[in-house]
């Protein structure tokens, strides 16, 4: 313990020995002084210890209706998928709270398959679920995975991403959510098992089986391939919720063929024509996934199948404007920081939606379209102090015309911002 003061009579911190002139604040107690730096250090130590002792529990898991309501704030449409996800997630964490057994009845895990076109909201739904539940969340790309012994990522690297998202708190990671994207890309190339190796297809499905079902996996802390004499992080995947998403391009004819066969048998081609193109995926069954190329054991690990519909023009316009973090609101906020008001005319929003449909990118392509439209504006406006308002019109999107700019004196410019 340091003396309270030095030879010059200056007060000192009793812990680090710094004088009152070397620190911002010195707090006095009964026979002791402590500086602001030591207080901050002590606070960090206490918080770390409390975080370690805090057991990860889910006593107040939102009810399915509440989960759906929160999803509605961020994701437009897709009501059936939201309901399926809300129920599956609620049951999953209810199962964790019950320690997987109720009166000796073991509750099985319900991983989820999300099937829908690109840009329909699969990843956003999974991300929002993790945010609602405040659990670690990781996204993995199935196309980068290969089975053990081949060039590519081991499936255990998926778990490493979750551990990293949990700041290496393994107990917390063991109750997280992993979203595996592009799972349709690991379908085997034909319905019949082949004697040749399918390194990026069936082999990956086989490798994923154990972690989907629940196992204690050994994860290399630095990622990459496993090798002998290496330290591993042990993680139990029993309570990790896996959501596997994919576009499953080409599954529609499989579904139509089955629907035709089941309904009238001979002459099913005619019946297929009556199936609503937009709602084909709503009829998907495990047997369709089997014909598509997923192996039976893998399908069995994904008992909940939720489909997402393609987004139409109205849905895309709603996505641009209605969610809490809608793109229009984001760009309006960006320009507001430069003291400029941004307005999107209704015609502009409709044209943006049409472009996204033409490009077949769904909601995912909306940002890139707006970024392209706003490039010149966002380049010029920070240097222009005379502009009060920027208006994107139908012509701005459809004909690549310059946005309307309103000056502070009310003058409207229809030319480029450099005018």
Swiss-Prot record:
SMART domains xref list: AAA (SM00382), ClpB_D2-small (SM01086), zf-C4_ClpX (SM00994)
GO CC terms in record: HslUV protease complex
InterPro entries registered for this protein in UniProt: AAA+_ATPase (IPR003593), ATP-dep_Clp_protease_ClpX (IPR050052), ATPase_AAA_core (IPR003959), Clp_ATPase_C (IPR019489), Clp_protease_ATP-bd_su_ClpX (IPR004487), ClpX_bact (IPR046425), P-loop_NTPase (IPR027417), Znf_CppX_C4 (IPR010603)
The keyword Transmembrane appears for this protein: no
GO biological process, one term: proteolysis involved in protein catabolic process
Keyword vocabulary terms for this entry: ATP-binding, Chaperone, Metal-binding, Nucleotide-binding, Zinc
PROSITE patterns: CLPX_ZB
Superkingdom: Bacteria
Domain ClpX-type ZB: 1-54
SUPFAM superfamilies per record: Glucocorticoid receptor-like (DNA-binding domain), P-loop containing nucleoside triphosphate hydrolases
Binding site for Zn(2+): 13, 16, 35, 38
Binding site for ATP: 117-124
GO molecular function: ATP binding; ATP hydrolysis activity; ATP-dependent protein folding chaperone; protein dimerization activity; unfolded protein binding; zinc ion binding
Keyword Chaperone part of the UniProt annotation: yes
Function text: ATP-dependent specificity component of the Clp protease. It directs the protease to specific substrates. Can perform chaperone functions in the absence of ClpP.
Subunit structure: Component of the ClpX-ClpP complex. Forms a hexameric ring that, in the presence of ATP, binds to fourteen ClpP subunits assembled into a disk-like structure with a central cavity, resembling the structure of eukaryotic proteasomes.
NCBIfam families registered for this protein in UniProt: clpX, PRK05342.1
Classification via PANTHER family: ATP-DEPENDENT CLP PROTEASE ATP-BINDING SUBUNIT CLPX-LIKE, MITOCHONDRIAL, ATP-DEPENDENT CLP PROTEASE ATP-BINDING SUBUNIT CLPX-LIKE, MITOCHONDRIAL-RELATED
UniProt similarity note: Belongs to the ClpX chaperone family.
Protein name (record): ATP-dependent Clp protease ATP-binding subunit ClpX
Annotated organism of origin: Bacillus anthracis
